[in-house]
Amino acid sequence: FSVLAIAVFSENYGKGKKLGDSVVIPFQVNYALGKSGFSLAAGGEANSSAGFGTTLGLTHSKATKEILAISVLSYQLSSAQNVKFFGLYEYKPALTEKWSVYSRLQLTYNQGMAEGFHNRSFLYLRAGLKKGPLGFGLGANFDAYGPSKVARENYGVFTRWEF
């Protein structure tokens, strides 16, 4: 068994720009299917816009000192019947004994099967440095909301801490 939990917080700087303000916390318990990297997943997602939902899915993961790759295909057990793909991919090659490059690609595509249209998608990119549990650098977020894929972009700096 393993646990996957991620917290994503997004807030606009400008007043009156509420599209994209959100907190999303997906979490799941995985049951490994042998040593293939594949797992059956069950969990939920707390979402400041959509509320709470339970999910079932399939996960593939691979983790080394330099690479982290997690792919999750899940189905939300709700009236919306959302099917979601989530991917998180990191590359962290060492520069010295204490420092490494940090790069990350995180994406989601959520399709509402009951309504038959796109609900939410995003692509988050990070590039920077890492020393121990601390990471920092430049980031870009590309978000799309609803069936017409209303877009929001955000560029800036990021910090992160690995627990």
Indicate where each model-derived feature is located.
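Transmembrane beta-strand segments that form the barrel wall of outer-membrane beta-barrel proteins
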Residues: 1-13, 34-48, 66-77, 101-113, ...
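Membrane-embedded beta-strands of outer-membrane beta-barrel proteins
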Residues: 25-29, 54-58, 85-89, 125-127, ...
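Solvent-exposed loop/turn segments connecting transmembrane beta-strands
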Residues: 12-21, 44-54, 74-85, 111-119, ...
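Short secondary-structure subsegments characteristic of cysteine-rich extracellular domains
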Residues: 119-131
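Outer-membrane beta-barrel channels and translocator barrels
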Residues: 30-38, 61-67, 92-98, 130-134, ...
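Outer-membrane beta-barrel "beta-signal"
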Residues: 151-163
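Intrinsically disordered, low-complexity regulatory tails/linkers
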Residues: 123, 140, 154-156
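Detector for outer-membrane/organellar transmembrane beta-barrel domains
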Residues: 53-54, 59-109
